[in-house]
């Protein structure tokens, strides 16, 4: 039954998309040919359906009956209006008959390759979903939204702040058929992409090149693994290519109604993935160049905003940042730190590769560093330059260039998928007249992309076989998933952690398989702060190590500010202050509730420099630079003769001065004598760190055996105030002994 439910959920969702798109393209006057109607109508309908589901989620009425009724309405309307039907076949001279020998040769290669890989992909998509991002992130948010029947404000996971246009289609599929249904919907986008490439080749009079390019795209190992899981990259590629396709249809007829479809899809590009919005740039530029008029451009932009603005508004309302999780420097908020964003983006630009000149080999043959490969055949990508000699080739190379530019923001192989339709067609249209060469090229690509052959030359992320028994649930779903450690961790969390409780993890979980919320150390400010405190518990380099004191001129002060004047030597270095203390005649001024504390940057964390805990610290969460400051307003003048800062050992370039306000209210430096000494704590900070996590609502830790600090948690669990509930599948689940942790008060 689970297998049938998964198939039903996917088929129902795909049918609704196709029905909705069919009705829309009929009313736009689009004269689609038989071979191109399904891919173009399906993707266009997906854009519109995603917006309807967005509205359902916003209204908090995402119940299974509501979603089924929505899908049923789309299918029924298309059937009643007759728009569901495919156009009658037409005999076009441009697609004229091929020589018999060529037809047989190409038919054999095309038929065998398409059939074999369709079976491979179908059963992999149908099998239980356990892909890294699919089961954790994409379906994690879908299952979370369905539990609350709509959108939920999530400030603890930066991944959930991205636009979720493709995931909206996973919502009804998941509600009906769970995880595999969503993966099958993505597989439908893979099919649509291949058919669209094939259709475009036929439309421009290059049927062989179109067929070969469709296989070049769809047989690529990275397309296979991505398009059969609940990722979104293949769907994004299909949406982007559809924008190009509709723009070319408009260029043939100059029917302005077709720009509505192109505009909706360009906006849907943004809803699918931020960088895909570059297709609006392409569409606007092409239409403006061809018409020299502003009215068509307004139609394009207006329709695109219909799709994009809801996602911009959602992020603005929930996170105070319309393009979260990016641009936090320009849209400051307490949820995502600037430095984490920059470190993450820097890593995405390199993936640990010392030399980016190795990228061509990495993404085509190796694939381990960039998490997937296109296939060796794409080493022939320079063939695309031959397309510049033809008008049709230049039409393809312009969007390819625009999309390819965005790739360098994240050089993972799957981020090249949107380039493949344009690149593949451009590579092969010059070979239209050399059918045997096309057949050999596709045969080579098919052989080198088949799983058993792939394993001989790479260990990159790719499909490993045809899991038909798992797909048909001849192997029980629980048994199939149980072979994956990540799934077992999720079940461990579900078993021990009470509903509503948070779990902190250094590893991440397949969130779609648990109803508990996991805080991954990297994805949000709350997790960053908890991880920082816990790391201090076992890593002495992060603990307080220096006392910087400033002897002030005698007098009374109301406002004091410590200003950073040093410059970091590495981007990761921050300004960290564990405690800022004020003294008079050797006695610390007692902290009062009326004190006003401020800091720049990170004003939200300033209290950590005044909480009397060495297991916390105010951090700039930006690279240490001159001009940063932390201020205390005593609300009245008080005698102060010393400012003392407790600094950690991982800030090497911090240099500071103390300022106060002058008679005119402006800040003026004080002639303060600086003293510095090192300190060492004899008392462990482990339990203090645990208390900080407990204080923020975290009473459970999932620690993998090879996580940093894992040995310390296991060996000194009593010192941490933890009880290990279970150790299995290479990970331990700990519970905080809340009766054993208390507010820290360790002072040097």
Question: How would you name each of these model-derived features?
Answer:
Residues 31-41, 180-181, 197-219, 238, ...:
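Transmembrane-helix signature of polytopic, membrane-embedded enzymes
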Residues 479-526, 694, 698-707, 734:
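Short periplasmic/luminal acceptor-recognition loop of GT-C membrane glycosyltransferases, typified by
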Residues 107-114, 260-264, 280-284, 298-305, ...:
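Signature aromatic-anchored transmembrane alpha helix within multi-pass, membrane-resident enzymes
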Residues 544-555, 568-638, 648-653, 660, ...:
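Disordered, acidic Ser/Thr/Pro-rich linker "stalks" and the adjacent N-terminal cap
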Residues 199-203, 243-259, 385-391, 431:
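Membrane-interface transmembrane helices that cradle and orient dolichyl/undecaprenyl
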Residues 1-94, 545-548:
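Membrane-embedded, hydrophobic transmembrane alpha-helices
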Residues 115, 358-401, 438-443:
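Hydrophobic, aromatic-rich transmembrane alpha-helices
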Residues 129-140, 444-492, 509-511, 657, ...:
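Membrane-proximal, lumen/periplasm-facing interface regions of secretory-pathway glyco-
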């Amino acid at each position: 039954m689970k297998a049938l439910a998964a198939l039903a959920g996917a088929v129902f969702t795909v049918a609704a998309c196709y029905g909705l798109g069919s009705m829309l393209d009929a009313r736009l006057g689009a004269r689609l040919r038989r071979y191109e109607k399904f891919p173009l109508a399906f993707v266009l309908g997906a854009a519109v359906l995603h917006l309807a589901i967005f509205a359902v989620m916003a209204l908090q009425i995402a119940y299974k009956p509501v979603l089924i009724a929505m899908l049923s309405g789309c299918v029924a309307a298309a059937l009643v209006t007759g728009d569901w039907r495919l156009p009658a076949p037409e005999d076009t001279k441009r697609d004229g008959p091929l020589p018999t020998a060529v037809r047989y040769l190409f038919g054999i290669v095309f038929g065998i390759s398409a059939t074999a890989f369709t079976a491979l992909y179908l059963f992999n998509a149908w099998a239980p979903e356990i892909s890294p991002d699919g089961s954790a992130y994409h379906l994690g948010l879908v299952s979370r939204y369905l539990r609350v029947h709509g959108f939920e404000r999530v400030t603890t996971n930066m991944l959930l702040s991205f636009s979720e246009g493709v995931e909206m289609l996973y919502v009804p599929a998941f509600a009906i058929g769970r995880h595999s249904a969503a993966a099958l919907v993505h597989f439908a986008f893979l099919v649509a992409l291949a058919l669209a490439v094939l259709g475009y080749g036929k439309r421009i009079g290059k049927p062989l090149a179109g067929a070969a390019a469709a296989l070049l795209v769809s047989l690529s190992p990275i397309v296979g693994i991505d398009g059969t899981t609940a990722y979104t990259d293949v769907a994004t590629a299909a949406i982007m290519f559809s924008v190009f396709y509709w723009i070319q249809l408009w260029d043939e007829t100059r029917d302005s109604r077709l720009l509505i479809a192109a505009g909706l899809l360009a906006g849907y590009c943004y809803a699918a993935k931020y960088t895909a919005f570059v297709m609006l740039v392409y569409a606007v530029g092409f239409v403006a160049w061809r018409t020299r008029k502003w009215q068509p451009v307004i139609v394009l932009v207006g329709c695109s905003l219909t799709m994009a603005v809801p996602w911009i508004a959602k992020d603005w309302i929930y996170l105070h940042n319309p393009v979260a999780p990016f641009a936090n420097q320009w849209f400051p908020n307490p949820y995502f730190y600037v430095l984490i964003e920059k470190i993450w983006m820097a890593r995405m630009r390199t993936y640990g590769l010392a030399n980016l000149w190795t990228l061509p080999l990495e993404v085509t043959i190796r694939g381990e560093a960039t998490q997937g490969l296109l296939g060796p055949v794409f080493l022939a990508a320079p063939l695309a330059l031959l397309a510049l000699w033809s008008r049709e080739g230049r039409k393809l190379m312009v969007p390819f260039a625009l999309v390819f530019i965005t790739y360098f923001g994240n050089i993972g192989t799957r981020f090249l998928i949107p380039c493949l339709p344009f690149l593949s067609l451009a590579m092969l249209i010059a070979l239209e007249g050399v059918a045997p060469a096309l057949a050999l090229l596709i045969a080579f690509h098919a052989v080198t992309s088949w799983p058993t052959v792939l394993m001989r030359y790479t260990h990159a992320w790719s499909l490993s076989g045809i899991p038909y028994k798992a797909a048909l649930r001849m192997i029980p779903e629980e048994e199939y998933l149980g072979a994956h450690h990540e799934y077992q961790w999720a079940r461990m969390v579900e078993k021990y952690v009470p509903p509503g409780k948070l779990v902190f993890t250094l590893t991440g979980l397949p969130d779609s398989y648990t109803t508990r919320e996991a805080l991954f150390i990297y994805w949000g400010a709350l997790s960053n702060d908890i991880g920082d405190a816990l790391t201090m518990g076992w890593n002495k380099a992060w603990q307080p190590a220096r006392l910087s004191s400033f002897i002030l001129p005698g007098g009374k002060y109301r406002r004091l500010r410590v200003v950073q004047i040093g410059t970091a030597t590495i981007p990761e270095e921050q300004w960290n202050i564990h405690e800022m203390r004020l003294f008079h005649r050797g006695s610390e001024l007692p902290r009062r509730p009326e004190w006003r504390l401020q800091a720049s940057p990170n004003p939200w964390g300033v209290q950590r420099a005044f909480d009397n805990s060495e297991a916390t610290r105010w951090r700039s969460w930006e690279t240490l630079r001159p001009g940063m400051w932390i201020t205390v307003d005593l609300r009245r003048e008080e005698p102060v003769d010393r400012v003392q800062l407790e600094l950690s050992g991982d800030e090497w370039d911090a240099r500071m001065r103390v300022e106060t306000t002058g008679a005119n209210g402006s800040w003026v430096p004080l002639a303060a004598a600086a003293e510095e000494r090192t300190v060492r704590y004899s008392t462990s900070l482990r339990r203090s760190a645990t208390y900080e996590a407990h204080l923020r609502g975290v009473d459970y830790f999932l620690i993998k055996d090879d996580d940093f600090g894992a040995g310390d948690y296991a060996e000194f669990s009593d010192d941490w105030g933890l009880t290990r509930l279970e150790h299995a599948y290479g990970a331990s689940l700990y519970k905080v002994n809340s009766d054993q942790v208390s507010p820290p008060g360790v002072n040097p």
